[in-house]
């Protein structure tokens, strides 16, 4: 016959106390980028925004924009106008992975090309100051299946099902 554990009675009391405590609702922490709120960032001129981003992004922005990036800016402005009217803008598809995410792009959905397909990404507050390419990785982990018949020397002696 199996021996039973002696019950000390302490564990049950702790559980009852935990049930009595009420859990406070979690408050969402207000987003800040380098001490600025999203509203302050959106009102900020682009020159001032360039001063607070890291040096790599600042250097990219100082070099100017290419014709492809200019097209992307026009698409962003068009999508912003649609959202101001209350319409849902379409996904903005782009190959520009080296474009810095600015505060005016927050809330829009982008299709970023990763070399094979367009990854749909909805930009949130935490992505400000990063590159679009960081949001759509170009490499993925390959999951190989089991090797087929004749793939290895040892499989020559395995009977076929």
Swiss-Prot record:
GO terms for biological process: ribosomal small subunit assembly; translation. Residues 1-19 have a biased composition (Basic residues). Keywords: Ribonucleoprotein, Ribosomal protein, RNA-binding, rRNA-binding. One of its GO terms (molecular function) is structural constituent of ribosome. Residues 1-26 are annotated as: Disordered. It comes from the Archaea. Pfam families: Ribosomal_S19 (PF00203). PROSITE patterns: RIBOSOMAL_S19 (PS00323). SUPFAM superfamilies: Ribosomal protein S19. The keyword Aminoacyl-tRNA synthetase does not apply. GO terms for cellular component: cytosolic small ribosomal subunit. HAMAP family: Ribosomal_uS19. PANTHER family: RIBOSOMAL PROTEIN S19P FAMILY MEMBER, SMALL RIBOSOMAL SUBUNIT PROTEIN US19. Protein S19 forms a complex with S13 that binds strongly to the 16S ribosomal RNA. NCBIfam families: PRK04038.1, uS19_arch. Belongs to the universal ribosomal protein uS19 family. This is Small ribosomal subunit protein uS19. It comes from Methanococcus maripaludis (strain C7 / ATCC BAA-1331). The gene is rps19.
